[in-house]
From Swiss-Prot:
Participates in chromosomal partition during cell division. May act via the formation of a condensin-like complex containing Smc and ScpB that pull DNA away from mid-cell into both cell halves. It comes from the Bacteria. This is Segregation and condensation protein A. It comes from Mycoplasma pneumoniae (strain ATCC 29342 / M129 / Subtype 1). Residues 1-166 form the DHFR domain. PANTHER family: SEGREGATION AND CONDENSATION PROTEIN A. Belongs to the ScpA family. The gene is scpA. GO terms for cellular component: cytoplasm.
Amino acid sequence: MITLIWCQDKHFGIGRDNTIPWKLTEANQHFYNTTKNQTVVMGYNTFQELGDKLTDHNVVVLSKKHFEELQNNTNIKVFNSIEKLLQHHFNRDLYVIGGKQIFHHFIELADRLIISVLPVDFKCNLRLKLGLDSFELMQEQQHSQFKVQYWHKKHPERLSFNVFLEDYNGTLPNLLELLIDKKFNLHQVDIAKITTQYLHLINTNLNKQAIEPITDYLVITSRIVEQKANNLLQINDIALDSDFLDNKLRDKLVAQLVEYKRYRESLDDFEKLRINRLAYFSKDNDFNRFIQTVDKSNTEPVKIEDELPNYVSVLKLHHAMNKLMQRWRAQFLANKNISIQELSIEQVQAEILATIKQFGYHSVSLKRVLLKVNHHISLMYFITAFVALLVLINNQIIDIEQTSFDDELYICLLDSSRIEQLQETPEAMVERAVKQRQEAQELARQVAREKAIANAQKREAYLKAKYGKDYLTREQFLKLSPEERAAHVAKMKQLKLVKNDNGRDN
């Protein structure tokens, strides 16, 4: 949970000349008790003002300009971007305490606001005015010197679309349930009233963040309007069987309502996926950040990670692949079914190499390669092909060329004899993988056998040292007669008892 906490005077003032103008013990104690032992996030100026007083807090400073300056401070954590800060403190409570720019950056991410309001004017030249339309006041506590307001972010369900008809008062999703279960007649739905109420709801929340949760009601409302319009236009068409037509149109509408309900139920899951995706870390396109020198005496820069060959940067490769993807975008979107396609990078590598070989050229455009693929190109195949290209480049099997930023991407074979050797069919590749797995299992069994033999040899050496000439190996013991075995066992038991007694005496 992200909480914004600050103190302001009656005119929204929060500071004067980068300092806090009031010295109120009660207000300071409230701030300390609320944030004690918590992670507090602040900017550089706020850290300079309050940093030495936050001894019982986990201090986090967000600053790009002073990032290098504060990095050596072991008592705090410093970040130069909100994304990195949130990634490092994922699923932790954060208290944002200032200053003004930090509040503006975090207001849309905040779940709660704690505002201490002073009843007087402190002549501040730094004021904080945030839009609180997406929050609602849950509680207000009055103290002797100030009052504290607790604001919580509005839940989307509280902004649901409520319709008021002659025979029904409630939310649109509940009306949807009644229509699906055929417990409410479509002819009783007053479209004019629903449309008027929906437009009023949109106009009321037009400039607020709250508009997002209710926009999806537009689809289902338009479906009901369409159904009602079709019924009205076909009343006088005596050539059609009205009962059959009504049932057919009603069934079509019910099917659409059921599909809409499924989308509504899946929104929460997609929202969780979206939030989880925000915590992922992505690598920058700029390779300059990976350049470093070995030591001070060596001024020549050394790259930790090499660029792609022929000066084709990752950005250019991404741009070229994105252009190809846009050409197939309409084809991808036309397919409404989400299917799971099992693909391996090795399989796609083999297909790419086989396609290049079919053209008989030294180099061929990636577009022609993908167009030559025998099966249907899906989005999953396209992404796998992108990864396969990177693997082939990394293994120095192919090279890529591009004359300009917007030009086609061309693939070149580096070693034709090596390509011939690596060229495999999917069946041969599966067979090779199975063979490799069997070899790995056999190797594991061989290692286990060798380990068992080594342990047996160690045990035999230990027993020989312990019992001397009286010790017999398993093979020697099996060659004895039953009488000799019984005598040997009795002798060994006696030796064990004697050795145990000697050990206790010592």
